[in-house]
């Protein structure tokens, strides 16, 4: 788990989190530190897959991102991508605190290359990102990922599932934490590639893994969008199946 803004304290002490996930929390303070840790953990491996089209056999080169030295890493968590992108953005500003026009393109390109790399990692990928309201000018709003630059417009293409966090009050007065899984004008990025989940579900990753198993996905890439305090970090506890 990469904790970019000390949100992991929601899950407990460092020792409690290590016991929960099997590894300690990683907390890089700069974008370059994050890249260094990722490069220490993973490597890119090129493999050739043979595919038959009728009587024709085609060689396809595939790039796979795998853990180094046979280390077992079942899941990678980034909390949050909003803060990670800001850490990189801070390295691009000049002495006046502003970015040049070409730097916005550099920001987009770097974040896209990072997303392409980490979404090739096998297993489960969970990325949390803060949300931001956009006024559409007709009295309606939509919720976007809080990422400066244009990455927020198409970030969902990298993921199998994109959920928005919501809270509702139950009849007994308790707060219930749910995920919005279906696309609407307001929840513009929401999606479920299995098309098996209801429009609203409790914030429980085991529900996602059930439909992933049914569809026989080989990996699971999940983006969670929501405001602070809406369950993004707390729900990470459900990555562990306590019944297994």
Q: Can you name each region flagged by the protein language model?
A:
Residues 221:
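Walker A (P-loop) ATP-phosphate-binding motif of ABC ATPase nucleotide-binding domains
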Residues 232:
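Conserved lysine of the Walker
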Residues 235:
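Hydrophobic positions on the alpha1 helix immediately C-terminal to the Walker A/P-loop
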Residues 228:
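The conserved Walker
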Residues 72-154:
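P-loop NTPase motor core
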Residues 133-217:
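Conserved GTP-binding G-domain of TRAFAC-class P-loop NTPases and closely related GTPase folds
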Residues 224:
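Hydrophobic anchor at the beta1->P-loop junction of P-loop NTPases
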Residues 2-98, 108, 244:
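Conserved inter-motif catalytic segment of the P-loop NTP-binding fold
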């Amino acid at each position: 788990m990469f904790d970019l803004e000390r949100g992991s304290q929601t899950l407990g002490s460092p020792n409690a989190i290590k016991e929960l996930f099997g590894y300690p929390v990683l907390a890089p303070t700069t974008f370059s530190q994050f890249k260094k840790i990722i490069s220490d953990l993973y490597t890119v491996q090129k493999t050739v897959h043979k595919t038959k089209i009728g009587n024709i056999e085609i060689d396809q080169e595939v790039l796979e991102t795998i853990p180094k030295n046979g280390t077992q890493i079942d899941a990678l968590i980034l909390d949050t991508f909003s803060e990670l992108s800001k850490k990189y953005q801070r390295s691009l500003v000049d002495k006046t605190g502003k970015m040049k026009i070409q730097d916005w393109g550099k920001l987009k390109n770097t974040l896209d290359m990072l997303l392409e790399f980490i979404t090739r990692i096998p297993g489960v990928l969970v990325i949390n990102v803060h949300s931001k309201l956009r006024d559409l000018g007709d009295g309606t709003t939509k919720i976007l990922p809080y990422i400066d630059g244009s990455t927020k417009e198409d970030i969902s293409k990298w993921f199998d599932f994109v959920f928005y966090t919501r809270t509702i009050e139950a009849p007994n007065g308790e707060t219930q934490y749910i995920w919005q899984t279906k696309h609407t004008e307001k929840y513009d990025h929401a999606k479920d590639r299995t098309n098996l989940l209801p429009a609203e579900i409790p914030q429980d990753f085991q529900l996602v893994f059930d439909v992933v198993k049914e569809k026989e996905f080989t990996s699971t890439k999940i983006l969670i969008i929501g405001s602070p305090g809406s369950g993004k970090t707390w729900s990470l506890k459900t990555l562990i199946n306590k019944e297994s």
